[in-house]
Amino acid sequence: WAAQHPGHGAVNWGGYCAVGELDGSRGWLPSASGNANSVDYPWRVGVPYRLTVARATGDLATGPSAPRHGVPETRTSGPHAAAPPPGFTAWRATITPLAAGPDAGVSANVGSPAHTAEPQVIRDLWAPGDRLVSPMVWSEVFARCDAVPVRVAWSNPTAIDERGGVHRVQSARVNYQSVADGGCSNTEVSVTAAADGPAWLHSTSTERRTRPGTPLRLAD
């Protein structure tokens, strides 16, 4: 819910290191805000999306590329692709709409990246090292604490190792942004049923029942 972007829709792929923000390629989509980390993206209510993070392929990754098991096929390079500095790895974020939702054709124009089921590269983020550890998911909702409630469900979290082994995540530990850091006290994380199985549900403008540090399992 980013007011600087068309329809308040945006996707952010950025990160931090010890000395500040991580660098990366330019976004593969326009950015009305001019923020290198955030590009315009017309999310549609009720449409499931797959977020994939994997090494960029070929000469755009400093380390050996992981096997492409389960990774969307996208162009190796795009209009803004660039190789990372020595010692860094290019981590590519890709979003793929999985099905049509109840408002398909209303919130997105024909030909826009969220109207088709084609994978859409967001950008490459450059980080030191060549492994991903301690993954997390979160919902960055740029809305007032008393705004209309928003719900985001994260389901089917899966990691694929370099040998193609599939590891399905079953549990996560809850955390919230503190009020002192700009967060709200009325956000909540719970477990709900989604179309493809149990999911972690992130809710805003609601009563908080799950305390920080609580482990939430998707299946017992």
Where are the predicted features?
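Short, aromatic/His-centered strand-loop micro-motif at the edge of beta-sheets
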Residues: G27-P48
